[in-house]
Amino acid sequence: APAAGFFGMR
C-alpha cells in the first residue's frame, strides 16, 4: 500500500 507512505510523508 504505497498510499500509506504518501500520507505518512504529508
UniProtKB/Swiss-Prot annotation:
<keyword id="KW-0964">Secreted</keyword>
<keyword id="KW-0027">Amidation</keyword>
<feature type="modified residue" description="Arginine amide">
    <location>
        <position position="10"/>
    </location>
</feature>
<dbReference type="GO" id="GO:0005576">
    <property type="term" value="C:extracellular region"/>
</dbReference>
<keyword id="KW-0527">Neuropeptide</keyword>
<dbReference type="GO" id="GO:0007218">
    <property type="term" value="P:neuropeptide signaling pathway"/>
</dbReference>
<protein>
    <recommendedName>
        <fullName>Tachykinin-related peptide 6</fullName>
    </recommendedName>
</protein>
<comment type="function">
    <text>Myoactive peptide. Increases the amplitude and frequency of spontaneous contractions and tonus of hindgut muscle.</text>
</comment>
